[in-house]
UniProtKB/Swiss-Prot annotation:
Protein name: Probable nucleolar complex protein 14
The encoding gene: NOP14
Domain of life: Eukaryota
UniProt keyword rRNA processing, yes or no: yes
Keywords: Nucleus, Ribosome biogenesis, rRNA processing
Quaternary context: Component of the ribosomal small subunit (SSU) processome.
Length: 799
């Protein structure tokens, strides 16, 4: 039979040297032995012994490492936790959370609206407002009634009144404690007569202070009311008093004699006041300094243009920004507009020479007033009676009369007028001006100069109207294709190239305009000579846009190839074996002359493109062909020469040039273009495309890997990393959800136990209270019963 737990505990403690005989005599000469256990080791040993004798309070697991204390039972197991203590800690935490939640119950959740009728759905808004107003006035009148009541000594509370306003009494005596207090006060006053004056209490002092403050406040309000009455009386008599003052004769200034010295002094003081304050004058700069500043300014502007061409912008702080960072600052700030104030009133730009015949005829006409038209119909109405050459003079007069510094709002008017001027130039281009071609050119050039000056100041307004017009052109082109274009559209694209910076990588007006020009070159079917002529004009405009940036435009290559082939191919070539690289829209535009000669100054006039002109068709072909060869030579010499694909681009035109050379040897431009291509190819460094050079990497070789404890149920061997991570996250989420649900169940059970305990305590308190009441009643009834019995016995004994 095993021994008791106490004997085992004593034996274990003695075996570890924790108990036993401690009064063993030691030799004095011998050295003191070191303690067998230090404090930490002793504490660990005691903890192990305690855990051994309380096996159900410690959660253990098998020790993977061999070795243990042979003196202890189950020393090969390791403690991993104490469920009892953990449970106790969790219970304490839940109890604290429950108490905090119970304290905050009914203490949060917003504001309770106690206004009258707020929760009554039967009342309208007017009824609620009326009732609230009535109650507020009643409360205010009650406060004002007792505000200055100096005889009101009832500080303790209101007097009890019945429904008729009478004081409540019982058997003729008042229920208020004030009467009893007054009686007691009278008795104390009688007793205190003849005694020295006592010190006032704090309550009496405060009552006196309140009474005095009420009295003084009433006095101040009375004085204020009296002052306001006097002011009102003076206001009523103000007109009469001023009338009396105006009738009095004042002494004239001329009648007063002022000495000459004082007059001179006053004049001198006024001159000094009107004179500008002295300021240090700028030093006169030499011609070298002025040239240097101008050169620095030009270099700075060129640097800014190059940055915009590369797609980089700089803000005021010098930080570079990309095209995507454009904001409202792109238009220019108000300060920049104010700096350009002198553009509108520049004499050299707006004033007309007196010797001009148009200016003299314009001044001779009687104009009542110059208005600043805000729409194009208004402007056309103002131009009635004016010749074509007088219109620019009228425009200059409008700009001079509506300078921004002359009146407020002129800046907005001139901004709108700049839009009207652009529309008017397009309107004039769409009119028939064959007979007045020289006057038309002169007028449009003057308008363009004026619009250029206005665009420097009103850039945003002109940009907005330009973008709107580009959208209008695009919509018309979608519906009617080539028939939607007119002279005004061509002139508009020319004006855009003059007004705005065409070298920018992205521009709010130039970029959309160039996109739609390329769309024209690609989508228009060039099935007639006039269409090819229009395309050559559009090509010249695109080259003008790219004169500085020199970007490669694929649509120009496509149009040049198609136009040159259309002008060299004849209907007879259809039956031959001639192969064409692209599909042509017509075969009727080829040159019919055997030895054509290209002029040096070939010009294609706009008025000949969209009207039935009498120009010879062969002359128009020669002019168009001359322009095309000139554009091709310019592209090869200045635009495409820096491209890495220069040989591939020129391969498109080499067979076409060879055909022209064979059929029309009189065209010497072809030979010069071929020589230029050969020379450019020699200078061009063409490197084929290649991948980036990397160091060769060795193919990794892996030895086969074997696992002794292979178990796919415990470890995932999926080669897909993404799916493996997803499964891992799902498992972790499942584990966390399970843990949270477990904690929620524990919290719910704990709260249920706490509520049951509270209900039990309430029930016990209630029952104990009721039992106490019943016991008290029974005790009193029993005492009264005994008393009654005694009295009954006494009465019976007397009988």
């Amino acid at each position: 039979m095993a021994g008791s737990q106490l004997k085992e505990l004593k034996a274990t403690l003695k075996a570890h040297g924790l108990t036993g005989q401690t009064n063993v005599k030691k030799s004095k000469k011998g050295k003191r032995e070191a303690k067998k256990y230090d404090h930490e080791e002793k504490a660990r040993t005691i903890a192990k012994i305690r855990d051994r004798f309380n096996p159900f309070e410690v959660k253990t697991t098998k020790n993977k490492r061999k070795g243990g204390d042979p003196g202890l039972l189950n020393s090969d197991r390791v403690a991993v936790g104490k469920p009892g203590i953990s449970k106790q800690i969790g219970e304490e935490a839940r109890r604290r959370a429950f108490e905090a939640k119970k304290l905050m119950k009914k203490r949060k959740g917003g504001v309770i609206d106690k206004r009258f009728g707020e929760r009554d759905k039967t009342l309208t808004e007017e009824e609620k407002m009326l009732e609230r107003f009535t109650r507020e006035r009643q409360a205010g009148s009650q406060r004002k009634k007792n505000l200055f009541n100096l005889e009101d000594d009832d500080e303790d509370g209101p007097i009890e009144l019945d429904m008729f306003g009478n004081k409540l009494t019982h058997l003729g005596e008042s229920l208020s404690l004030a009467d009893d207090l007054n009686v007691q006060a009278e008795d104390t006053e009688d007793l205190e007569e003849g005694q020295p004056q006592r010190k006032k209490t704090k309550l009496e002092v405060m009552k006196e202070i309140i009474a005095k403050s009420k009295f003084h406040k009433q006095e101040r309000q009375a004085a204020q009311r009296k002052l306001e009455d006097n002011i009102d009386e003076l206001d009523e008599d103000f007109d009469d008093v001023m009338a009396e003052l105006m009738t009095t004769q004042t002494l004239k200034q001329d009648d007063i004699e002022v000495p000459a010295e004082e007059k001179d002094y006053d004049i001198k003081v006024k001159e000094l006041n009107l004179e500008k304050r002295a300021a240090p004058a700028d030093r006169t700069k030499t011609e070298e300094e002025l040239q240097k500043e101008a050169e620095e300014r030009r270099q700075k502007l060129e640097e800014q243009r190059l940055n915009r061409m590369q797609g980089m912008l700089e803000d005021e702080e010098g930080e570079e920004r990309g095209v995507e960072d454009l904001d409202d600052g792109f238009w220019g700030s108000d300060s920049e507009v104010e700096e350009g104030e002198n553009i509108a009133n520049s004499d050299e730009d707006i004033e007309v020479e007196s010797s001009s015949e148009e200016a003299i005829s314009y001044k001779s006409k009687k104009l009542v007033a110059i208005s600043c038209p805000q729409t194009h119909p208004e402007f056309l109405n103002d131009l009635k009676g004016l010749s074509l050459l007088e219109q620019p003079i009228h425009v200059k007069a409008i700009i001079k009369a509506y300078q921004p510094k002359l009146a407020e709002g002129n800046k907005v008017k001139l901004a709108n007028f700049s839009k009207v001027l652009l529309k008017h130039m397009i309107y004039l281009a769409n009119q028939r001006y064959d007979k007045d071609l020289i006057k038309f050119d002169k007028t449009q050039n003057e308008f363009l100069i004026i619009l250029k000056r206005l665009s420097e100041k009103y850039n945003q307004a002109i940009s907005e109207v330009s973008r709107e017009y580009i959208l209008d052109i695009q919509e018309r082109f979608k519906k009617q294709n080539f028939h939607a274009l007119n002279n005004g559209d061509i002139l508009f694209f020319i004006i855009v190239g003059v007004l705005f910076s065409t070298s920018d990588q992205y521009h709010l007006v130039v970029t959309p305009a160039q996109i739609i020009l390329c769309e024209f070159l690609e989508q228009i079917r060039f099935k007639s000579l006039k269409r090819i002529a229009v395309g050559s004009v559009l090509l010249r405009i695109i080259l003008q846009y790219q004169r500085l940036s020199k970007r490669y435009i694929p649509e120009t290559v496509y149009f040049l190839q198609k136009a040159l082939l259309s002008l060299v191919v004849n209907p007879d070539d259809i039956e031959s074996d001639m192969t064409l690289p692209i599909r042509l829209d017509t075969f009727d535009c080829g040159l019919k002359l055997k030895e054509p000669s290209l002029p040096d100054d070939a010009v294609v006039h706009l008025h000949e493109l969209f009207t039935k002109s009498t120009t010879n068709e062969e002359d128009l072909k020669i002019n168009v062909l001359s322009n095309l060869f000139e554009d091709l030579e310019k592209l090869i010499g200045s635009h495409w020469n820096n491209e890495a694909a220069f040989p591939e681009i020129c391969e498109i035109f080499e067979p076409i040039l060879s055909v022209y050379k064979v059929r029309y040897p009189s065209i010497t431009t072809v030979e010069s273009i071929e020589e230029k291509i050969k020379r450019m190819k020699k200078l061009n460094k063409h490197y084929p495309l290649a991948l980036q050079a990397h160091r060769p990497t060795a193919i990794p070789s892996y030895a086969p890997k074997f696992e002794e404890n292979f178990n796919p149920a415990k470890k995932s061997y999926d080669t897909d990393v993404a799916r493996n991570e997803v499964n891992k996250m799902k498992a972790q989420l499942k584990k966390e959800r399970k843990f949270v649900m477990k904690e929620l169940r524990k919290d719910t059970k704990f709260e249920a136990r706490q509520r049951i305990d509270e209900k039990k305590k309430e029930a016990e308190a209630y029952h104990s209270k009721m039992s106490n009441i019943i016991n008290t009643i029974n005790t009193e009834e029993g005492a009264e019963k005994n008393k009654y019995e005694r009295e009954k016995r006494l009465r019976a004994g007397k009988k």
